[in-house]
């Protein structure tokens, strides 16, 4: 089993974990339907950037 040769300091441990934090999703209000959706994604109505690009899933 691998064992560290030297103790990792709290600072180095925390720097190692700096990329593990969760990021909140970028949620915006869709101007065509008025519902919440992820930014830069097609809404459930099939609209993207004010234009219908896919069939509606609703």
Swiss-Prot record:
Question: Which GO BP terms apply?
Answer: translation
What keywords were assigned to this record? Ribonucleoprotein, Ribosomal protein
Statement: the UniProt record of this protein carries the keyword Ribosomal protein: yes
**Which is one Pfam family of this protein?**
Ribosomal_L32p
Record keywords: Transit peptide included?
A: no
Kindly give the InterPro entries that the UniProt entry links to this protein.
Answer: Ribosomal_bL32, Ribosomal_bL32_bact, Ribosomal_zn-bd
Q: GO molecular function terms here?
A: structural constituent of ribosome
* GO (cellular component) term, any one: large ribosomal subunit
PANTHER family named among the record's database cross-references: 50S RIBOSOMAL PROTEIN L32, LARGE RIBOSOMAL SUBUNIT PROTEIN BL32
Q: Which family does it belong to?
A: Belongs to the bacterial ribosomal protein bL32 family.
This protein is called what? Large ribosomal subunit protein bL32
> What gene is it encoded by?
rpmF
């Amino acid at each position: 089993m691998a064992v560290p040769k030297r103790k990792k300091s709290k600072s180095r441990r925390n720097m190692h974990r700096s990329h593990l934090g969760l990021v909140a999703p970028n949620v915006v209000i869709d101007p065509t339907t008025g519902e919440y959706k992820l930014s830069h994604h097609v809404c459930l109505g099939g609209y993207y950037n004010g234009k219908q690009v896919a069939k509606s899933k609703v």
